[in-house]
Amino acid sequence: MLVSSINSAVWGVPLLVAFTGTGLLLSVRSGFFQITHVGTWMKTTLGSIFSKKSRESGKGSISQTQALSAALAACMGTGNIVGVAAAIASGGAGAVFWMVISAIIGMMSACCENILGIKYRYRDENGEWMGGAFVYMERGLGFRQMAKIFCVLLVIASLGIGNMTQANAAALSLSGSFGLSPAITGLILAAGVFAITCGGLKRIASAAEKIIPAMTAIFILASFAVIIKNFRAVPSAFSRIISEAFSLRAAAGGAAGYGIKKALRYGVARGVFSNEAGLGSNAIIHAAAQTDSPAEQGCWGILEVFLDTVVMCTVTAITLLVSGAPTDGDGSLACAAAFGSVFGKAGSIFVCVSICIFAFATLIGWSYYGRRGLEYLLGAKSAKIYNIIYAAAVFVGCVADLELVWELSDLANALMAVPNLISLCLLSGEATKELKKTYHN
């Protein structure tokens, strides 16, 4: 298929190098802030959660914890469960190592996106905060046409990777586990998404704040139950991750260097797909956070990548590896087998429910990205039309064959990243200067 071939070429080594290279540039210019100032960004984020003053001070529409939850809702989709299994199947256990390394590097991309998002944000015609990659492209660089192209791709991606593919994963999971008709799943999901998205960002953030922390905690606790039961296999799992990350040959043979190349490629790709650092999407929600400090919001971007990939994806990977579940096939089946090794039939049900809840969270999170992109292009009046189209796309995603949609949405994501990575590089000095000014780096 032509689109598939183009997609494979676009999402090849050059783009993954661009993601990593941009993260490295920002890391170097910030003095590797994400590593040298762990205590600082942890205190700024997790340490402030119990501080009412910190959470509610400054300009903005939603609290910083709500912004984090909403951004995590958008990126913590089904990929954090089945996508990790797919990465291991394609790149071996070593992919997990490179996934974490790419996330650590990508933390500074997320940080600087948020810094620039807050610095250049403004109120739109409805008085809502407008910010994100397309705003700093226009206001920071004067690249309005680039910003428009970014928004077109953002809208396409929101209907694809942020909508139909997530809905499809939920429908397939419910159909396989309970025999529920995809059409019924589609109607329920579409109604739920429409009810929340019509309430705007505050309703989206409120829902995300209730869903994400609770579901993430439950998933991690269930994962630890599997890990504890198989604790003797933990050293072996870590040994595999390290050894296969630097293996010169793939597990099934191949040319020298092929193993490490696959582990690198699929590990970095999984990290990018999971935390979205470098895509420029998450900064759209963070731009509405209540804060007067761009650098402070940048720290929340670091935490977001840490929780999404370093914690969530790594825990999923260790769970799969210690359980002995087959990781060379369908990702959802591998996860079901892993949790089933401890919880039996309930394990499969748990995976199904987790996929559905995380998919729903992604649906409501990405709806805001697409809506803001369309509003930037056509004005605030387009929001109502977008909400209707978005809900309809949820239903279509549940009942349709989405092979082409997957390919097109992946392509849109890749093309979104290009202008954003260019912008981050051009504004790298400005972003890191803001960070150093605030934290006396």
Q: What is the predicted function of each stretch?
A:
Residues L26-S27, S102-G127, A133-N168, L172-T197, ...:
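Helix-loop-helix module between adjacent transmembrane segments
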Residues F32-I62, A86-V96, A110-L141, P326-V342, ...:
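Flexible loop linkers connecting adjacent transmembrane helices
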Residues A18-L25, R29-M42, N168-L174, L180-I242, ...:
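Membrane-interface loop-to-helix entry segments
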Residues M1-A74, T78, A89-A95, G106, ...:
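N-terminal alpha-helical transmembrane segments of multi-pass membrane transport
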